[in-house]
Amino acid sequence: FSPFENIIGHYEAHDEQIPDTYSQYANIAMETLMLKCQPAMEKTTGLKLYPAYTYARIYKKGDELKRHKDRFSCEISTTMNLGGDDWPIYLEPSGKEGKKGIKVDLKPGDMLVYSGCELEHWRNKFKGKECVQVFLHYNNCKTPGAKENMFDKRPHLGLPSWFKR
């Protein structure tokens, strides 16, 4: 990796969700994708949305995404399969913790839209070699605090997380 890897992405040893994976917060290409997808997202959800941030990750064999709900910036979320081996995501739409959930398989190019703050979601232990995902996150313009949270509290898109206000 280049000496610039901490600018464009990095291996995160202490990541709370998936330690020791390569990840990128706010990659400029992914943030551009988020803006390009916004009209379709608004049509799909029936909501006017503010863009929050993007996050991309390369998962490896043995990784596991524990059951969780997301933070406020992930109110309206997507996960898009960019390539690699199959790795289903599970959602629990009833809102009841601990239930089995619904399995969703995503092929490369497929994108799932979900309410990240409301739905428990997870992935079981990964058995493949690698799986590349990007997450595009938005807020509903009508949600209190959404305007102040635009761009995940950065002055504009494309900036690293340390620019948050």
Positions of the model-derived regions?
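Non-heme Fe(II)/2-oxoglutarate
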Residues: F1-T45
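Alpha-helix initiation and capping sites
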Residues: E31-L35, Y50, K69-F72
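A short coil-to-beta-strand element that immediately follows conserved catalytic motifs
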Residues: G46-Y55
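Conserved active-site beta-strand element of glycosyltransferases/polysaccharide synthases
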Residues: I58
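Catalytic core of non-heme Fe(II) oxygenases with the double-stranded beta-helix
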Residues: K61-W122, E130-V134, N139-R154
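Glycine- and charge-enriched low-complexity intrinsically disordered segments
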Residues: N149-R165
